[in-house]
Amino acid sequence: MKILILCDMFPPAFGPRMGYLCKYMRRARWEPVVVTEQIDDSTFSFLKGETPVTYVNFFHSKGKILQKLEWICIFILDYFFHYKDKKMAKAASRLLEEGEYAGILCSSYRTFPLPAAQYIAEKYHLPLVIDLRDIVEQYASNEYIAHNFRTFSWLDRKITETFRHKLLRDRNNALRKADQVTTISPWHVEKLQAYNPNTELVYNGYDPELFYPEQHRTSQFVITYTGRLISLATRDPRLLFEAVSRLDREKLIDPDQFRIQWYVDAGSKAIIMQAATAYPVARYMDFFDYVPASEIPGVLNRSSILLQLANTFASDGPKGFMTTKLFESMAVGKPLLLSLIHI
């Protein structure tokens, strides 16, 4: 039975939820067929597998200035005319014309490509399931926006406010038309049931074929964090830094035996280093680039404690974060250090 999946990301780019889903759908004799945006990333190349994928490329320019201009043009076209969704729907329609499909699944972290999925589900009279991995309301501020507009501060606020309104309007319209909605945490379920009562919880989970306990002897006590920090409002390491500073002050640890290892991107490293300036912890920290997702189980199993960062739940704080990293960390059986977490 064929299922058409529209999603904003899919392996080899970051996209574990849909990547793992397709892996196990095929084993259950379903036939997932994917339409997704072309993204230059190979973090999850091992999850591509044999799933047929149509990659829709929206960005073609080379060079920093041309890329910026192209991004602005695409943003404007998409804002006013649903450019990306229309192009995605066109690619999906070609597939639907070629064969029989039992339904459509659309997975998004924000809104795109929900309007495309809504359109083709109505056009071809197919049931629509929407899966929301993240939603705008969960963020403490504007972390859901990948690019800063960098105009005047007052204009930035106006653009952001208008953009947020459009994202929510388009998302909620699609939710109301969906036959089923799935999402990642109890908080998300409660929030989304206001738009579609048929909203169910499907945790991110982990792949037991990759993540399981292993025994490794190490010469150092290692606290490990893998992932991204998009802001201190969402993930705050300062409570950890305060604790390490106290242990250092009381001479209970030393850098030869105690390490904090960060597997993060350059933007996350900058946030961490800025947060650490008020604490004498730099000599305890090591930074590594992202590693392929297939190597993460080994990194976790060679650690002493796995760090999970969050921030205090509040009306203006982060809400409902239950990432794949949390479940993968639990799967390897290591102790978890949770900083200011509320889920």
Regions found by a protein language model. Name each.
Residues 257, 262-264, 269-298:
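Nucleotide-activated donor-binding/catalytic signature segment of Leloir-type glycosyltransferases, i.e.
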Residues 187, 205:
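Carbohydrate-associated surface elements
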Residues 86, 90, 112, 119-123, ...:
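Membrane-proximal helix-turn-helix segments that form the acceptor-binding/catalytic region
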Residues 179, 300-319:
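Acidic donor-binding loop of glycosyltransferase active sites
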Residues 1-58, 180:
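N-terminal subdomain of nucleotide-sugar transferases
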Residues 215-237, 241-244:
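Conserved donor-binding/catalytic core segment of Leloir-type glycosyltransferases
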